[in-house]
A protein has these predicted regions:
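N-terminal subdomain of lithium-sensitive/metallo-dependent phosphomonoesterases centered on the IMPase/IPPase/PAP
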Residues: 1-89, 244
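Small-residue (primarily alanine) positions within well-ordered alpha-helices
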Residues: 15-18, 136, 204, 211-213
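Active-site/binding-pocket entry motifs
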Residues: 28, 73-74, 136, 162-163, ...
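Generic detector of well-ordered alpha-helical packing
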Residues: 48, 71, 88-91, 122, ...
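A structural micro-motif at secondary-structure boundaries
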Residues: 138-142
Length: 246
């Protein structure tokens, strides 16, 4: 593995430990007890279990870091500057329906900046990770955004209800974290979506940036109702024109 920080190593170990429980639960999906959390957002025992494992591992290593997570919200600790941002299962609905497209997402926010992040797809065993000024990687191999420069040749990812993307070639996968990871490694050429939570995209933000992509400025003090437009540099302005009313 290329040289990584102690904090990123902690994140990798936490995600790998949580993934073992997720894979077991995914194999017995019909036995999961699910409680309704919102009209299109369901929380499962697997989600809660994975988050607990991740938080325990992170706290063991850095007990004073604050935590922002999907299930527990913001847990302020002595160190308010550094915050772990956790989504134990991004793509929960896919997971609950037996669709093997979901991921663990963990990022570290220092003040108002994401400085490291990982997105782990336990089914495909793909670990995407990045650190500030150190590049983006997939399973120890450096990754870059695509070099497409014609918007008609591109494939984009989006999610939720959108009204302005009809003339863009796009896919809706149900997993924002993997959508952004796929932009970072060139599988998608861009990603756009409304109404995101910070834990959905925190790791993806640094992955795209470190892979050479462009994103609109994001207020890191805001944790909900985020809008993301991310893409390869050569089509960024054209994509923004297409999404002028997005």
């Amino acid at each position: 593995m290329n040289s990584i920080s102690a904090n990123l190593n902690i994140m990798i170990k936490a995600s790998e430990k949580a993934s073992k429980a997720l894979i077991r639960d995914f194999g017995e999906i019909e036995k999961l007890q699910v409680s309704k959390k919102g009209p299109t957002d369901f929380v499962s025992n697997a989600d809660i279990k994975a988050e607990k494992i991740i938080i325990e591992e992170l706290k063991k290593a850095k007990p004073n870091y604050s935590i922002l997570s999907e299930e527990n919200g913001y847990d302020e600790q002595k160190d308010k500057k550094n915050t772990w941002v956790i989504d134990p299962i991004d793509g929960t609905i896919n997971f609950l329906h037996g669709i093997p497209h979901f991921a663990i997402s963990i990022a570290l926010k220092s003040s108002d900046e994401i400085i490291s992040g990982l997105i782990f797809d336990p089914i495909k065993n793909e670990m995407f990770y990045a650190e500030k000024n150190n590049g983006a990687f997939l399973n120890n191999h450096r990754i870059k955004v695509s070099k497409k420069n014609q918007i008609n040749d591109c494939l984009f990812a989006t999610g939720g209800k959108t009204n302005n993307e009809s003339d863009l070639p796009y896919r809706k996968s149900g997993c924002a974290a993997l959508d952004m990871a796929y932009v970072a490694c060139g599988r998608y050429d861009g990603y756009f979506q409304h109404d995101l939570n910070l834990w959905d995209v925190a790791a993806g933000i640094i992955l795209v940036k470190e892979a050479g992509g462009l994103l609109e400025e994001i207020d890191m003090a805001q944790t909900k109702k985020l809008k993301i437009v991310a893409s390869t540099p050569d089509i960024n302005s054209k994509l923004k024109e297409k999404l002028a009313n997005f």
